[in-house]
């Protein structure tokens, strides 16, 4: 059987927001079970407190000033390889689900699978947005720190 890697990364989650780190009020049984069966880090460091650059470092192993993604909405350099590309170069299929944020577009991404990842298992936020109903799409697009979100009429 081929070895498999499953890498889960939550977005904007402090340590005290997950039960496995000791907060009895946070009910996160699935994350707690994964932490029990996998690797749970006690200390963390981010090279950049902004989503895109932080993700670029995690997925490339290089600092943002080296890979070109020094802020959100700026793509990494074309010659920069992600872990998915490196793994696929070695015969390991790679899929991705979630907020990509490495293509230089807006929050939702382009919906296009980058080189080295399996397009059958590629689902970024743009793909998610395209599946939403118009009410939910409007709510998601309008939710920001600057504007008020409206609840869908079906809620």
Where do the protein language model's features map onto the residues?
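Formylglycine-dependent sulfatase
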Residues: 1-140
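Single conserved hydrophobic/aromatic residue that forms the stacking wall/gate
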Residues: 135-137, 141-155
């Amino acid at each position: 059987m081929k070895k498999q890697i499953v890498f889960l990364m939550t977005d904007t989650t402090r340590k005290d927001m997950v039960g496995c780190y000791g907060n009895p009020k946070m009910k996160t049984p699935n994350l707690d079970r994964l932490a029990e069966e996998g690797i749970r880090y006690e200390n963390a460091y981010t090279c950049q407190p902004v989503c895109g650059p932080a993700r670029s470092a995690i997925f490339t192993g290089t600092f943002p000033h080296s890979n070109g993604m020094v802020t959100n909405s700026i793509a990494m350099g074309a010659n920069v390889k992600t872990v998915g590309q490196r793994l696929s170069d070695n015969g390991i299929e790679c899929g991705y689900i979630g907020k990509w944020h490495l293509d230089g577009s807006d929050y939702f991404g382009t919906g296009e699978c980058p080189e080295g990842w399996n397009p059958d298992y590629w689902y970024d936020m743009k793909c998610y947005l395209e599946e939403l109903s118009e009410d939910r799409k409007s709510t998601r697009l309008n939710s920001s720190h600057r504007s008020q979100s409206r609840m869908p009429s079906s809620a």
